[in-house]
């Protein structure tokens, strides 16, 4: 098993030089490795508060920072959970605490719990998770605007795929973001729609691993 772990580490290092993520995933699955990151223990502990599958939380962290605790985005988001300064402060992180893995994940779970409450009228839990993910990426206000447009134009405001995601994309058109039902203005939704898809894609990958 020690040799297997060393080989896996070598593959991960080589990934920067062109080894595909699919190859790594197949390798992990073949050897039944028991974790997806060095932060699994923290993720499993904190996500109990949320009641989600820990692998969904791990998928969020992967998409946010690739498990790089020092990650900094071009917009200034930092840490594993990629908090912007104002959001970090709102959820109890001061200064460089955002770079502390345990504190960042704990605050990330608190934010996700806040978002779940914002979308608690969506009865289906799996569907609600998509709205929470979109809210994490875009902010809940823009998602609420998309829900309002969906309802106004005859789509289901509680369904993401093919409904609210479509109206989130429409928020870059003045006809829609200036609609009286919208409160948060212009928004480019492509990244958020892709983000939701990518988190679920990574989650489905993680659920195929043998733990």
Predicted features and spans:
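Bacterial N-terminal signal peptides
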Residues: 2-10
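Catalytic glycan-binding domains that act on GlcNAc-containing polysaccharides
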Residues: 17-211
């Amino acid at each position: 098993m020690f040799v297997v772990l060393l080989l896996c580490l070598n593959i991960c290092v080589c990934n920067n030089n062109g080894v595909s993520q699919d190859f790594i995933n197949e390798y992990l699955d073949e050897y039944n490795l028991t974790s997806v990151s060095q932060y699994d223990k923290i993720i499993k502990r904190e996500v109990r508060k949320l009641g989600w599958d820990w692998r969904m939380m791990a998928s969020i962290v992967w998409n946010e920072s690739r498990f790089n605790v020092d990650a900094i985005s071009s917009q200034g988001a930092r840490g594993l959970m990629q908090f912007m300064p104002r959001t970090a402060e709102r959820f109890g992180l001061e200064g460089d605490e955002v770079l502390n893995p345990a504190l960042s994940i704990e605050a990330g779970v608190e934010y996700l719990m806040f978002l779940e409450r914002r979308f608690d009228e969506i009865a289906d839990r799996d569907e609600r998770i998509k709205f929470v993910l979109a809210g994490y990426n875009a902010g809940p206000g823009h998602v609420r605007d998309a829900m309002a447009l969906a309802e106004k134009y005859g789509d289901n405001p509680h369904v993401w795929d093919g409904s609210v995601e479509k109206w989130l994309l429409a928020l870059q058109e003045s006809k829609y973001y200036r609609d009286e039902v919208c409160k948060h203005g212009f928004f480019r939704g492509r990244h958020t729609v892709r983000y939701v898809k990518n988190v679920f894609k990574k989650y489905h990958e993680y659920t195929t691993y043998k733990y």
